């Protein structure tokens, strides 16, 4: 189990939902937490629930914001042991109708490129100070597949960003295998965040197949996954089943093309 006593953690997307729960869980384990979110009132509200927390309002879609945030977080206490790169935005347009506009570009800017810019700022800091760090990116069940629970919804571009985030994290894991940083990818299924609450005000009425969990449970799984040193941190058992159609489809195509040895 990781000893967070005296450590400093930065949590982005901390105004609500998973980010807020991660910040509270890390504080409960002994960490000092810096919170960041584009929602200034929300992130200050979260900070008010955590003794000693520091809140920053920033828009990670701004190319200079991720690096500046990492520097500010390090300067706060002179160390930065963990970053939970959790900030993300959603979308609700069918891909066939999705214009490549500012909203589409913002999806990739926040969900993918901000996470990369955070790593690019964090690693040199660790190398400069001789410290070892830890970084967890928040992906999604949509990082792995088109989950059964969301088929028919209009979140295709969001799903594409979460696929991209996972592949990027896997490449970083390979590139940084000798670097002083431990990487993790949290892949939540259905979590009762404010975004979900707008469509489903009463969580007790969620369809059982959705497997809806509270943000606090998601944070508990996330910290347990880091304790265990896991790179992939899924929150729902169905994620493995959701991946099966893709792998089976590729296997069937190889058979049809005669590209797999028989027997």
Task: Label the predicted regions.
Residues 29-45:
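Conserved glycine-rich Rossmann-like NAD(P)H-binding loop of the short-chain dehydrogenase/reductase
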Residues 40-41, 56-68, 101:
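The beta1-alpha1 cofactor-binding region of Rossmann-like NAD(H)/NADP(H)-dependent oxidoreductases
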Residues 2-34:
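Canonical Rossmann dinucleotide-binding motif of NAD(H)/NADP(H)-dependent dehydrogenases/reductases
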Residues 136-164, 169-170, 174-177, 190:
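Catalytic loop of short-chain dehydrogenase/reductase
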Residues 185, 201, 205-242:
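C-terminal helical subdomain
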Residues 7, 79-80, 126-141, 178-181:
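Active-site loop of short-chain dehydrogenase/reductase
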Residues 67, 90-105, 148-151:
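Conserved mid-core segment of classical short-chain dehydrogenase/reductases
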């Amino acid at each position: 189990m990781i000893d967070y006593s005296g450590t400093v953690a930065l949590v982005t997307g901390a105004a609500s939902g998973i980010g807020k729960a991660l910040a509270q869980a890390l504080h409960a384990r002994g960490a000092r937490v810096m919170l960041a979110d584009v929602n200034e009132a929300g992130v200050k509200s979260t900070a008010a629930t955590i003794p000693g927390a520091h809140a920053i309002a920033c828009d990670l879609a701004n190319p200079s914001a991720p690096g500046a945030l990492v520097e500010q977080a390090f300067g706060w206490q002179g160390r930065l042991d963990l970053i939970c790169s959790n900030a993300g935005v959603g979308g609700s347009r069918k891909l066939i109708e999705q214009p490549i506009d500012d909203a589409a570009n913002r999806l990739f800017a926040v969900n993918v490129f901000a996470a990369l810019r955070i790593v690019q700022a964090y690693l040199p800091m660790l190398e400069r100070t001789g410290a070892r760090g830890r970084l967890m990116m928040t992906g999604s069940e949509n990082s792995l597949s088109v989950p059964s629970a969301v088929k028919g919804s209009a979140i295709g571009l969001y799903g594409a960003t979460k696929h991209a985030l996972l592949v990027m994290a896997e490449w970083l894991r390979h590139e940084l295998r000798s670097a002083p940083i431990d990487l993790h990818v949290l892949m939540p299924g259905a979590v009762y965040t404010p975004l979900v609450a707008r469509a489903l005000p009463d969580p007790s009425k969620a369809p059982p197949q959705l497997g809806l969990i509270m943000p606090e449970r998601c944070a508990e799984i996330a910290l347990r996954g880091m304790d265990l040193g896991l790179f992939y941190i899924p929150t729902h058992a169905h994620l493995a089943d959701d991946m099966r159609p893709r792998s089976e489809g590729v296997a069937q195509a190889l058979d049809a093309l005669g590209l797999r040895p028989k027997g």
